[in-house]
């Protein structure tokens, strides 16, 4: 009996060690893919900024190319993150390897011609696709999903350089309110390996200083409570608006070619009229501006909000997370004087809590606040992100995300 238990224990530990080594392998492979994607996107964004708004002329035609690409060769790959959720839920057992390059190319096209979108979703799809492919070669229980979660963590960490955030996000995003504990032994080494390898090739996380903050007293706690409610509502509204705008546009313009072309014209005009391409791209300019001396306008956050939703609803590709960072931080700068708080501090709170509310996650936004702004601000991030998570009404930018809440 004792020997049997000992044998079982060794078997469990052997599996954990194997998962750790697999995680390192996944992290390294995914990181290289993220470097290609990230460096390519970096060049595209710099080129488009140098060219100014002239690239917007091609946005509707770029949309046609994206639809044609998926229609003729992408097929099921067009589901993107939706397919990742389907695999986790057992609705599908296959992520085609071609999904990664198709998402990369279509995202590059979107940004090359000035669309307002992010990059995180694509980074995680790259990781999920690559890791799920290797998962089929291992026979331990739920290896496909475990590898997929590890790949998502590696994808996030490889592009953003925030391994702790990546781990929490990958573990909690598939089913809100719970964690994929079984994937931890694979996701942790995958995430840290990806962050390290990508840093060797020049992909580093962004960090900002927000200065000193007063002690967490009753007055500040009340202000944080109100800020948490506000940021939570904005994040939830973004997720709600994205879901319903996509459905509305798809219902009104059923032909995907007409839809993306007509919406592409609308988005291009709006991007030019409002800000001369200020709201094109991932929103890095608004994020940096929020934490430096650059001018942030009172309408920056709402225009980035609307134009990102319109871009993604049209059928253009890209993520939502970096625009959410931009929306939250630029909103924080504007409302800080109302609360009598340091604008950099409120911008940091908005940066992480709007992201958390829109993705319906709790631990990841706290983690990214600490990794980007400093671990000493943990109590403040915890309070605001907790409130934002509570008030977002279970809305999520991921339509297939399941919720488990008592």
Name the predicted role of every residue range:
Residues 1-406:
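Alpha-helical transmembrane segments and immediately membrane-proximal extracytoplasmic
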């Amino acid at each position: 009996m004792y020997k049997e238990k000992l044998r079982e224990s060794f078997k469990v530990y052997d599996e954990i060690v194997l998962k750790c080594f697999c995680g390192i392998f996944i992290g390294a492979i995914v990181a290289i893919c993220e470097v290609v994607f990230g460096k390519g996107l970096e060049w595209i964004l710099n080129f488009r900024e140098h060219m100014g708004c002239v690239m917007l002329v091609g946005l509707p035609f770029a949309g046609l190319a994206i639809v044609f690409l998926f229609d003729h060769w992408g097929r099921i790959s067009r589901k993107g993150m939706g397919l990742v959720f389907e695999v986790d839920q057992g609705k599908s057992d296959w992520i085609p390897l071609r999904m990664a390059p198709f998402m990369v190319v279509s995202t590059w096209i979107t940004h090359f011609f000035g669309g307002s979108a992010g990059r995180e979703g694509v980074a995680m799809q790259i990781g999920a696709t690559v890791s799920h492919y290797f998962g089929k070669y291992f026979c331990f229980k739920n290896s496909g999903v475990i590898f997929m979660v590890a790949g998502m963590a590696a994808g996030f960490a490889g592009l953003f350089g925030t391994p702790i955030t990546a781990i929490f996000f990958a573990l909690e995003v598939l089913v809100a309110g719970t964690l994929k504990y079984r994937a931890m032994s694979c996701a942790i080494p995958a995430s840290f390996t990806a962050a390290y390898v990508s840093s060797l090739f020049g992909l580093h996380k962004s960090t900002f200083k927000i200065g000193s903050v007063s002690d967490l007293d009753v007055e500040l706690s009340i202000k944080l409570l109100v800020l948490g409610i506000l940021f939570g509502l904005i994040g939830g509204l973004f997720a709600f608006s994205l879901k319903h705008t996509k459905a509305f546009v798809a219902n009104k313009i059923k032909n995907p070619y007409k839809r993306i072309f007509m919406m592409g014209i609308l988005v291009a005009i709006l991007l030019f009229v409002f800000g001369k391409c200020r709201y094109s791209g991932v929103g890095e300019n608004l994020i940096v501006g929020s934490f430096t001396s650059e001018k942030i306008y009172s309408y920056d956050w709402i225009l980035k909000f609307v134009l990102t939703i319109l871009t993604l609803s049209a059928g253009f590709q890209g993520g939502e997370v970096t625009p959410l960072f931009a929306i939250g931080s630029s909103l924080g700068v504007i409302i800080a004087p109302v609360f009598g708080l340091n604008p950099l501090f409120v911008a940091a709170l908005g940066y992480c809590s709007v992201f958390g509310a829109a993705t319906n996650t709790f631990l990841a936004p706290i983690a990214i606040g600490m990794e980007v702004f400093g671990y000493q601000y943990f109590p403040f991030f915890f309070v605001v992100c907790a409130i934002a998570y509570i008030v977002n009404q279970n809305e999520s930018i991921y339509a297939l995300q399941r919720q488990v809440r008592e």
